[in-house]
């Protein structure tokens, strides 16, 4: 089992740790966060407003974080190059601060003895992998990889199934996206993106997202064929993708439902879900899929032009894929 260090104990860092303990697929051996001391880590890991209390034991003991009886080394370094991952036995590092997202910056972890780095965010220059879509293109010459974004992880599996079966001529995506930590509780300054600084709980906020264009990086045949935007809405978690696309081959909406259902039960099982239930966003809280196709919500204008809807827990689904990507990488060592 691969030994993992986590840099940044925020939403994704904590939930990757939860996903690791829930699944038992990887071994968390170290956590670094300069802003959260050990006792605070215990509290933050145990209690979660969105996903509920951790089902297990968590305590501080002898300067370590102990989860379900397993001791985890704690570091509080600001500079990633100073974290002694090797001493803690961490082979892979999950870079989840949101700050060190380039090859150069994330590469600092290798100086402390880590063998590989998984960036839990899109990266300008690191190769991006989406489980179920292009993870098989990974090869172990790569030291630093990106798990792309939560939205790309939702959109790409659906786009792959549609493109493989009917061909996507072009498409536009909108994600109706839950609040994240980068937003403001009340109106405040926000650099160049003025709208992003408006109160998150009070507004529907149009925002940019690179998620659709990023699909072109993980599915090269779709490069230049998709783009998209986001609406940030006042919900704490769970988002939904609306993919509106023109199809090469004519398809009835029932044909689309059929191929997505088949994929969800076959090659994309556990990654792409399928439901015909009358669901709403809360129904996907703590769901581990990257994407769940909502068969009842989509519409077709004609046999070549459709709007497809897919839900995702933007925190927990994504965190589970980070774990799955590490498991896959470890299988190639």
Curated annotation (Swiss-Prot):
Activity regulation (UniProt): Glyceraldehyde-3-phosphate dehydrogenase activity is inhibited by fumarate, via the formation of S-(2-succinyl)cysteine residues.
InterPro entries: GlycerAld/Erythrose_P_DH, GlycerAld_3-P_DH_AS, GlycerAld_3-P_DH_cat, GlycerAld_3-P_DH_NAD(P)-bd, Glyceraldehyde-3-P_DH_1, NAD(P)-bd_dom_sf
Sites of ADP-ribosylcysteine modification: 150
Binding site for D-glyceraldehyde 3-phosphate: 149-151, 180, 209-210, 232
Positions of post-translational Deamidated asparagine modification: 7, 62, 68, 147, 153, 223, 314
Active site, renumbered: 150 (nucleophile)
Residues the record lists as binding NAD(+): 11-12, 33, 78, 120, 314
GO biological process, one term: positive regulation of canonical NF-kappaB signal transduction
Site feature (Activates thiol group during catalysis) residues: 177
Positions of modified residues (S-(2-succinyl)cysteine): 150, 245
Pathway: Carbohydrate degradation; glycolysis; pyruvate from D-glyceraldehyde 3-phosphate: step 1/5
Single annotated GO MF: NAD binding
Protein name as it appears in the record: Glyceraldehyde-3-phosphate dehydrogenase
The species this protein was found in: Mustela putorius furo
